[in-house]
Amino acid sequence: MNMQAHLAVLAAAVSIYPAFAQQFGTAENLAPDIPTPQPIVERMLEAAHVKPGELVYDLGSGDGRVVITAAQKFGARAVGVEIRPDLCRIASERIKAMGLEDRVKIVQGSALRVDLSPADVVTMFLLTTSNERLKPTLEKYLKPRTRVVSNQFPIKGWKPVETVRARAGAMGYSIYVYEIGHTE
């Protein structure tokens, strides 16, 4: 199933079955596992203006594609935060196979409980309700000028410094770029 089909099924499930929508964005599970296509990963990191040596956190890192790309193509250090042990294992194996263990690590746990204060950039592909739940943590712990990049789902109440439209195959994406200290 391609990305467009995954998102269509997710949208249908959320609209038809409110209980499905409540399953994510509650407790610790912030989103279903829908990998971001590689061209969108790269566009997100470009939109964040990631620089060599900066620290990128990816919330809900899945198979590790964002943190791996941040290290390989942008020269950044990166931390992926993923709640599912199976995805942490897959990501860790990929990182080791690519020899990136000195610049990339995966933390198994909740994005709601991780210390984000060292981050220069935070990326995420979570639901709007999950973004709302994370917003107080982002506001409290991220230092001014930290960039927050959300794929597809805006952070309600924040004004993006940039909204990037991108395509991967037939699917269109909205990439919301925020900067702490300039979200109003």
Describe the role of every protein-language-model region.
Residues 129-184:
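C-terminal substrate-binding/active-site "lid" region of AdoMet-derived donor-dependent transferases
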Residues 1-9:
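Bacterial N-terminal signal peptides that target proteins for export
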Residues 117-133:
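A short SAM/SAH-binding and catalytic strip from SAM-dependent methyltransferases
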Residues 53-62:
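Conserved class I S-adenosyl-L-methionine
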Residues 85-118:
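S-adenosyl-L-methionine
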Residues 64-68:
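Glycine-rich SAM-binding Motif I of class I
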Residues 77-82:
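Conserved SAM-binding motif I beta-strand of class I
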Residues 17-51:
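Class I SAM-dependent transferase core
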